[in-house]
Amino acid sequence: MDLWQPGKRLLKGNLHAHTTASDGRISIEECIKRYKEHGYDFLAITDHRKRFKGYQDEDILVIPAGEYHRNFVGQAPEHAFHITGVGIEYDIIQDDSFSPQDIVDAIKSAGGFCTLAHPIWSLMTFQQCIDLKNYDAIEIYNTISDVYSGRGYSDLYIDMLASRGIYKKITAVDDAHHYDRDAFVGYIMVQAENNTWEEIHQALKENRFYASQGPQIHRIQVEGAKIIVDASPASCIRLMSNTLSGGRRTFYGEDITHVEYTLPESERYARVEVIDKNGLKAWSNIIVRE
């Protein structure tokens, strides 16, 4: 079984960006222009507590979206819940009476793809990630959280959830605000023939996408317990799973493009990481053992 079919069209997109409609530094028009110039096929403008109603021309699809949040600033411990809704079909009117679960439920009711944004940056606890129900994905990488706060990676929470049988889809995003070093880094590549939200959303549901900072995952094939990976040249390809020791499933070399790994009985799932010579990464979604 191929998780996505080689040779099929892949669309590049960012599911998290801000503009002057909330706390971003550039206008909606300038945001769209810059992502278009950088070769993105689709974009979600996720201003805080505001739904952008969408836009499309021959070069880029801008999906209706917003980011909804509860910030517990000045409390001990200080933390936040930020949750994006992409493809939401109507405005969500949110105030501080909403619990984080209310936000998720509202996004799902509005038909949205619901992502828990930057939980490590937000100083969420792991238990809070468990207690929050029915969200679709977690940002494994968030550019602004990395370059301005040093807390951009949430892979640990993804693995800890998966080891407990809670499998979330994996995205990488920019969450761009300043548009200096916090843009055009984290993105997803989605297999869809047509650049429409309907096809992109279906591909997200079916895990026909991967997250990246630059490396490419050309193919992941699953044959029973065997996982076969083809990728752009890498210095390391590794498979993360629910077991502790990773030596057997970590492959180092110069310009590695192909690895094969058979899951032992003790491993219930795996996800693939491809790391290039510059340390940039690509991440697959979680592959659950049949």
Language-model segment annotations:
Residues 1-10, 165-168, 174-290:
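C-terminal functional module detector
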